From Swiss-Prot:
It comes from the Bacteria. Keywords: Acyltransferase, Amino-acid biosynthesis, Diaminopimelate biosynthesis, Lysine biosynthesis, Repeat, Transferase. This is 2,3,4,5-tetrahydropyridine-2,6-dicarboxylate N-acetyltransferase. It comes from Clostridium perfringens (strain SM101 / Type A). It is an enzyme of class 2 (transferase). Pathway: Amino-acid biosynthesis; L-lysine biosynthesis via DAP pathway; LL-2,6-diaminopimelate from (S)-tetrahydrodipicolinate (acetylase route): step 1/3. Its EC number is 2.3.1.89.
Amino acid sequence: MSYNFTDPYEIARFIKEVKKSTPVKVYLKGNLEGVELGSIECYGNNDFYVLFGESDEVATFLTENKDKIVSFRLENDRRNSAIPMLELLNINARIEPGAIIRDRVSIGDNAVIMMGAVINIGAEIGESTMVDMNAVIGARGKLGKRVHLGAGAVVAGVLEPPSKTPCIIEDDVLIGANAVILEGVKIGKGSVVAAGSVVVEDVPAGVVVAGTPAKIIKSVDEKTKDKTEILDDLRK
């Protein structure tokens, strides 16, 4: 079944219909020789094993084979999860430990995703864009090329309440730390959003906005460009 991940109602339908998952990992001491594992993955030999599987199946397995088990320790990090984490191995970007990136996210070449960043389903991150520490990009948020999203900043998602219009951050925009871009807002190319601002309406290209709610305070000039320089070396 296919889904349109640019539509909030389609994303919601996907979350409703997809099979939910509660994966677990088990460190087990015992003798599992000849034991039927079903769909459980098992690695090890002699008297030590590591098992991977769904919670219900693993629980049944442990109960049915308790006479063969000396001890075990179970780890679990989610419950009835609908959307897995994005597979990162083939992405040409720098993604630091601790970033949380859901599946169905697009990340452009040479982007940088820092520790603690959270990126939800359907988001798009452009080439050479940096998402700094603890920044949040909600469902379907779109960041262009060479954007800097400051630490703790939020680009609101448009999944609930549903909206046809996502947040759009155009190329070469700098968003300061802890700024908030509300649902459906568009930030024009080359603009700067001051730290701590709350942006409630569209921002044209080439301006600086600040405050709560954010207002235009000036046009981007050479002094502004010097203070908001993007460093290519961080994106190599």
